Amino acid sequence: MAQIFVLGAGTPTPTPHRFGSAFAVHVGGEYLMFDCGPAATHKLVKAGIFPTQVDYLFFTHHHFDHDVDYPCFLLCRWDQSVGKENTLQVFGPTLTETLTERIIGEQGAFAHDWKARVNHPLSQRVFVNRGGTLPRKPPHVLAKDVGPGPVHRGREWAVNAAPAEHVQPYLDSLAYRLDSAEGSIVFTGDTQPCRSVVDLARGADMMLCMCWDDQERMQANGEAPGQCGTTGAAQMAQEAGVKKLVLVHIGPHLSTHGPMEKGIGDVRRLYSGEIIFADE
């Protein structure tokens, strides 16, 4: 099975143990990231992966808890490079290209940073000492807005996408399936239970699925539309025939003892496979 790192298993609400969404996968000798939420770059390094090792990033959607660390990741990966690394390729729904340009473009929010590092003698010396060769090149990223269907194929893997039902029409959302000889993994992103994600996940070895809260509580407080809770995640996984269900995007209420144990029990009643309540 491909190696999976849960960097962010939380929500927009920070807790001591979870905050935002971000995942890394080591497959076929390559590192991929899915989403880049709060502190994802730091969490990546804590997991033993340096930013320059990641060559592919896939965004499910552009809520801040899934992309707020994107500027940090882009700048850190570029700053720590020596110019011999592979070009970073970034895929995501509408706004992915625009956000990338707004961050590191010639008139981007952080253009002042990379221009100083490209041109100042001190930054040039640090770059050369690291192993780089002058002149130093500005950041270059291949960002692409994508939709449902085939997204990209690596050396030994392929990623396909399907629509996820979250907060349309304000933001487009995608779920991703990663297939390789090492197994099949689905990242639902943020979604309510829906046919498109079930079909994408059909027969997968693992599904990392949003699980915001106890489903009954969500129905009672009006937070069910656009989101998966406990039984929603379980029903999708069971219908898709997923072998292992990893619960992520876990809200603060469900993270507490009592609701956590009840939630896992509710999932177990509907889903017959292995259940993992994710930690970062």
Descriptions of predicted regions:
Residues S173-A175, A181-V186, T191-E280:
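Cap/insert and terminal regions of metallo-dependent hydrolase folds
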